[in-house]
Regions:
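Two-component histidine phosphotransfer core
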Residues: 1-131, 135
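C-terminal end segment of the histidine kinase catalytic
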Residues: 136-148
C-alpha cells in the first residue's frame, strides 16, 4: 500500500482504540510526514504494518495506573519511514520476557521477506517502558526494487 494509505489506516485505528480509554489518559500521537517525499504515494509499504505495534501498546498498558501512557510517532522523509510506539508496561502483565510473541515473530518474518536488510526493528524495555521502533530504508529498498 502507499504510505499515505498506511498513515490514514493507522490514524483511524488509533481513533477506534482511543474510544476504550479515558479522555484523561496520556495518549499522544505525533506525525512528521513529508508529503513531498517521492515515496508518499508509492505502493511501497506492507499493509497493516502499524497494527501489531498499536495493538500491543493497548494490550500491555494498565489504563488505571496514574503514570501510564502510550506515545505513537510516525515519520516519513526522503530516505525512510519510521514507526515508534512507547508505552508504560502494566505491572500486572508478564511482558517483561525479552522475546516477542507469535505476532511479533510473524511481523519480523514479513518485514524480512519484503525488505530484506533495508529495515531495522528494535524492541526494548527500560524502567517499565516498552519501546518498539521500526525504520524502513525506503531509498535503498526502492533503488533495489527498480534495478533488479
Amino acid at each position: 500500500v502507499t504510505i499515505k494509505d498506511e498513515i490514514d489506516f493507522t490514524k483511524n485505528f488509533i481513533e477506534i482504540n482511543k474510544v476504550k480509554v479515558s479522555p484523561l489518559f496520556d495518549f499522544q500521537v505525533k506525525t512528521k510526514i513529508d508529503e513531498t517525499s517521492p515515496y508518499y504515494q508509492e505502493k511501497i509499504i506492507l499493509p497493516l504494518l502499524s497494527i501489531d505495534f498499536i495493538e500491543n501498546a493497548f494490550k500491555h498498558t494498565d489504563f488505571q495506573q496514574a503514570n501510564s501512557f502510550i506515545k505513537i510517532m510516525l515519520e516519513l522523509n526522503n530516505k525512510s519511514f519510521q514507526i515508534q510506539v512507547m508505552n508504560k508496561i502494566s505491572p500486572k502483565n508478564s511482558l517483561k520476557k525479552e522475546t516477542g510473541g507469535h505476532g511479533s515473530q510473524s511481523l519480523e518474518h514479513r518485514l524480512k521477506m519484503v525488505y530484506d536488510d533495508d529495515f531495522s526493528l528494535s524492541k526494548t524495555i527500560e524502567q517499565d517502558i516498552f519501546v518498539a521502533n521500526l525504520k524502513i530504508n525506503l531509498h535503498e529498498f526502492y533503488t533495489k526494487m527498480h534495478t533488479n
